[in-house]
Amino acid sequence: NTSYAECSVSPEWLNLQEFSTWCTSQPLYNKTVLGRRTALDKDLLIPNNKVYSKEACLIIPEEINKALVGKRKTGKDRGLPCGIFKHGKKFITYRDSDKRFDSFSTLEDAARDYQQKKEGRIKGLLLKYGEYLDSVTIHALQEFTIKSRSIYN
């Protein structure tokens, strides 16, 4: 997967025992939450992080982890922010709630719409999973904003 091409692992975690010790100390390690698996996240705590380490990583519900990732682009959409596509002269964003698309005349309007949808989705997932999350994860999700992240990946 090319999205991991620039990523690395901390020297400490290159020792499998150290990584394993960290994993097993995490409350959600190897658990299911509301019927969903959990996943290792590297950039909720540190936006745009490229290093897997105990300082940066969390084990969170997979649904949250996937929601944090921007929508993948096709070749013709390169140069546009994640979650925004071009169709003719219009800029398109995807509506998760009813699996439809919204269209905008300007890139700025589409980006604002994408930001509001994404942040709203994260807040909704915080409500859904909040009772299962630790205080560090809850705080990171409460502070989540698109502005702090690179949406041009």
Annotated model-derived regions:
Residues T2-K89:
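Short, cationic Gly/His-enriched loop motifs
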Residues S8-P11, S97-E108:
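A short, exposed loop/beta-hairpin motif centered on an aromatic-Gly-Thr core
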Residues F19, I84, T93, F104-K118:
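An aromatic-rich alpha-helical recognition segment common to small helix-rich domains
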Residues C23, A56, S105-E108, K118, ...:
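Generic alpha-helical secondary structure signal
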Residues P27-N30, D109, I122, T137:
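Amphipathic alpha-helical interaction segments
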Residues K42-L44, E119-G124:
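The canonical J-domain HPD catalytic loop and its flanking helix-turn segment that engages Hsp70
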Residues K90-D96:
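Short beta-strand motif preference
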Residues R121-N153:
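Extended, polar beta-sheet/loop recognition surfaces of beta-rich domains
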